[in-house]
UniProtKB/Swiss-Prot annotation:
HAMAP family: ATP_synth_c_bact. It is found in: Cell inner membrane. The gene is atpE. PROSITE patterns: ATPASE_C. F(1)F(0) ATP synthase produces ATP from ADP in the presence of a proton or sodium gradient. F-type ATPases consist of two structural domains, F(1) containing the extramembraneous catalytic core and F(0) containing the membrane proton channel, linked together by a central stalk and a peripheral stalk. During catalysis, ATP synthesis in the catalytic domain of F(1) is coupled via a rotary mechanism of the central stalk subunits to proton translocation. Key component of the F(0) channel; it plays a direct role in translocation across the membrane. A homomeric c-ring of between 10-14 subunits forms the central stalk rotor element with the F(1) delta and epsilon subunits. GO terms for molecular function: lipid binding; proton-transporting ATP synthase activity, rotational mechanism. It comes from Campylobacter lari (strain RM2100 / D67 / ATCC BAA-1060). GO terms for cellular component: plasma membrane; proton-transporting ATP synthase complex; proton-transporting two-sector ATPase complex, proton-transporting domain. The record marks 82 as: Reversibly protonated during proton transport. This is ATP synthase subunit c.
């Protein structure tokens, strides 16, 4: 509780600072959100890819005759998983360089 109160008191100086500081806050939170969002997306993608590969290896071990079909399906699934991470990267780049919230701060 003491840490939260100290943090709020420490940040209150920034809240009453000059008008131009809002752009700095927006930039810093955009960088934080982009990094955090991309990190979570990459973590989820890595877990999904690991589960996909494990399931494909287990399926091939059970029935070696289906190995080719399982590999094809696995590559399609991996491409779909990786596409989600690339979408997160695009959103992070938009938040960093073409920030749509810039107009709200200027108003």
């Amino acid at each position: 509780m003491k840490k939260i109160v100290f943090l709020m008191l420490a940040l209150s100086g920034f809240a009453f600072a000059a008008e131009g500081s809002m752009n700095q806050w927006l930039a810093s939170f955009s960088i934080l959100a982009a990094g955090l969002g991309l990190g979570v997306a990459a973590l989820g993608g890595a877990i999904g890819m690991g589960n996909t590969a494990a399931a494909t290896i287990a399926g091939t071990a059970r029935n070696p005759g289906l190995g080719g079909k399982l590999m094809t399906t696995m590559f399609i699934a991996l491409a779909m998983i990786e596409a989600q991470v690339i979408y997160a990267l695009v959103i992070a780049l938009i938040a960093l360089y073409a920030n749509p919230f810039q107009a709200l701060v200027a108003a």
